[in-house]
Amino acid sequence: FGFKVGAAPFHLAIPDAYSGTSSMVAGVLATASKAMGFVALMRLLLTIAMPATGPAFWYGALAVISVVTMTWGNLAALSSDNPKRVLAYSSVAHAGYMLAAVSAIGSGLADGPASEMIVVAVLFHLCVLVLFKMGPFMVLSAIEREGGSHRVAGLNGLASGDPLMAASMF
């Protein structure tokens, strides 16, 4: 599941996969694939691998993976000049945020209602991520069709030239 959700150290292929394909295909990879992976991972960890009492054996490792994933995703995005790679690293960082929440459930410190709220928060985050990740990929797809650049610098002037398209990047 680490590769499917984009968790470090399994995330290394994600920036190459997003930047090496069309923006619409990358948008599907960034949304549908990640959503299905997270739902399956949460189902496995919280239904099958969760003990009746006390912490789960996997929560410590998942907590460390989530911290590394958050940090790596954000730092790597800073050095990229390809918008699809920036979005890929953003997906990696968001995977870390959601993994941190899942590891909080596994710690055993959250009681029943708190665990349920964490699950709802992760699912909400996942839904928002899916909705707001498609916008930038659609904009990049439109720019590609018009023969635009594959660099962040190619987005200069987008807000003055097409404000609606620029707003869709957020």
Where do the language-model regions lie?
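Alpha-helical transmembrane segments of multi-pass membrane proteins predominantly involved
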Residues: 1-170
